[in-house]
Amino acid sequence: MKHSPDRLFARPLAEVPDFAFNEDVARVFPDMIKRSVPGYPTIVENIGVLAAQFARPGTRLYDLGCSLGAVSQALRRHVKSEGCRVIAVDNSPAMLERCREYLHAQDSMFQELLPVETVEADILALALEPASLVAMNFTLQFIPPERRLELLGHIHHSLLPGGALILSEKLRFSDAEEHGLLGDLHLAFKRANGYSELEIAQKRSAIENVMKPDSLEEHRQRLLAAGFRKVVPWFQCLNFASLIALP
């Protein structure tokens, strides 16, 4: 499928609105996230690889905050356990509509993929069924901080023995020098990918009120408080990381 280049913040805006996963963002999202999140393609593809180690036959695999379904597609490519199915959940109608188009395109190119169900829902209100794998790829950071432990508790409760949560997030750092250095390097990554200073500044203004990153230690302690017994970081590139949490 074709997507448009991300030029959402290329012109000066009199007032920068809060970032939202609307039709404008859905249209450019593949370009936006590839140019904004270092290591994103590696994270997505390897979530599929890792998921294959935890998926159990006849169980659900959740992609919570699925956006355009990149993780769902990776799960379908890599998980071969018989009877598994992917549940892709997002609360944005615009994102989910395009997600369905991408999944349909995947179906037309490959045979014997896992079945996938798309669900428009708020994951905070979603009744999670038993699952062997839950993936949240840059989703928790958009959940109100006071609701994050509650959500992780629900996920922990839903996971079957031998299952796992794979959680990817942007990080902040308690050490000011480390936080500043990795922040500056992330800006350099964006510039190298063609974003102007205006685009970077306006995107930051749009997203700073809706995305609240945590530190790696905050993630670890919250996951343990939610009932997970082990938290293992498996990937980090600059200030973006992915963790495996075992129930």
Curated annotation (Swiss-Prot):
<feature type="binding site">
    <location>
        <position position="204"/>
    </location>
    <ligand>
        <name>S-adenosyl-L-methionine</name>
    </ligand>
</feature>
<feature type="binding site">
    <location>
        <begin position="90"/>
        <end position="91"/>
    </location>
    <ligand>
        <name>S-adenosyl-L-methionine</name>
    </ligand>
</feature>
<comment type="function">
    <text>Catalyzes the conversion of S-adenosyl-L-methionine (SAM) to carboxy-S-adenosyl-L-methionine (Cx-SAM).</text>
</comment>
<feature type="binding site">
    <location>
        <begin position="122"/>
        <end position="123"/>
    </location>
    <ligand>
        <name>S-adenosyl-L-methionine</name>
    </ligand>
</feature>
<feature type="binding site">
    <location>
        <position position="137"/>
    </location>
    <ligand>
        <name>S-adenosyl-L-methionine</name>
    </ligand>
</feature>
<dbReference type="Pfam" id="PF13649">
    <property type="entry name" value="Methyltransf_25"/>
</dbReference>
<feature type="binding site">
    <location>
        <position position="40"/>
    </location>
    <ligand>
        <name>S-adenosyl-L-methionine</name>
    </ligand>
</feature>
<dbReference type="InterPro" id="IPR005271">
    <property type="entry name" value="CmoA"/>
</dbReference>
<dbReference type="InterPro" id="IPR041698">
    <property type="entry name" value="Methyltransf_25"/>
</dbReference>
<dbReference type="GO" id="GO:0002098">
    <property type="term" value="P:tRNA wobble uridine modification"/>
</dbReference>
<dbReference type="GO" id="GO:0016743">
    <property type="term" value="F:carboxyl- or carbamoyltransferase activity"/>
</dbReference>
<comment type="similarity">
    <text>Belongs to the class I-like SAM-binding methyltransferase superfamily. Cx-SAM synthase family.</text>
</comment>
<keyword id="KW-0808">Transferase</keyword>
<keyword id="KW-0949">S-adenosyl-L-methionine</keyword>
<comment type="subunit">
    <text>Homodimer.</text>
</comment>
<protein>
    <recommendedName>
        <fullName>Carboxy-S-adenosyl-L-methionine synthase</fullName>
        <ecNumber>2.1.3.-</ecNumber>
    </recommendedName>
</protein>
<dbReference type="GO" id="GO:1904047">
    <property type="term" value="F:S-adenosyl-L-methionine binding"/>
</dbReference>
<dbReference type="InterPro" id="IPR029063">
    <property type="entry name" value="SAM-dependent_MTases_sf"/>
</dbReference>
<feature type="binding site">
    <location>
        <begin position="65"/>
        <end position="67"/>
    </location>
    <ligand>
        <name>S-adenosyl-L-methionine</name>
    </ligand>
</feature>
